[in-house]
Amino acid sequence: MKTFVFIVLVALAFVLTAAKEERANPSELVSALAELVMLDAERGVDKPGCRYLFGGCKSDDDCCPRLGCKGKGHDYCAWDGTFSD
């Protein structure tokens, strides 16, 4: 119980600190979020028509990035074991 209360207090302190920093300079937050969206677009995370985790597939090309077609008989998209940079 003591550990749970400690974790809640640390999380609350983190949220309050982050909110205070956001109010101090919201343009930095907006630019950071825009950069993340651009990086996802460059990596092809939002590739149209790709199959997500556990989606049906016929080949690795059917799956979204970082996923590969696995299984025998009932093929599905699963993590291919790679990490992003």
Curated annotation (Swiss-Prot):
Cysteine pairs bridged by disulfides in the record: 50-64, 57-69, 63-77
- Signal sequence span is 1-19
Stored InterPro entries: Huwentoxin-1
Q: Main localization of the protein?
A: secreted
Cross-referenced Pfam families, in alphabetical order?
A: Toxin_12
**Alphabetic keyword roster:** Disulfide bond, Ion channel impairing toxin, Knottin, Neurotoxin, Potassium channel impairing toxin, Secreted, Signal, Toxin, Voltage-gated potassium channel impairing toxin, Voltage-gated sodium channel impairing toxin
- Establish whether keyword Disulfide bond is in the entry: yes
Q: Name one GO cellular component term.
A: extracellular region
Q: Name one GO molecular function term.
A: potassium channel regulator activity
Provide the propeptide boundaries. 20-43
Q: Where in the cell is it found?
A: Secreted
Q: In which tissues is it expressed?
A: Expressed by the venom gland.
Give a short account of what the protein does: Multimodal toxin that enhances nociceptor excitability mainly by the simultaneous stimulation of repetitive firing (through Nav1.8/SCN10A channel current enhancement) and impairment of repolarization (by inhibiting delayed rectifier current of Kv2.1/KCNB1), with a potential contribution from tetrodotoxin-sensitive voltage-gated sodium channels (Nav) modified excitability. Enhances Nav1.8/SCN10A currents (EC(50)=1.1 uM), modifies the channel gating by a right-shift in steady-state inactivation and delays open-state inactivation.
Task: Quote the entry's note on domains.
Answer: The presence of a 'disulfide through disulfide knot' structurally defines this protein as a knottin.
The UniProt entry's sequence similarity note says: Belongs to the neurotoxin 10 (Hwtx-1) family.
- Record-given protein name: Delta/kappa-theraphotoxin-Pm1a
Source organism (scientific name): Pelinobius muticus (King baboon spider)
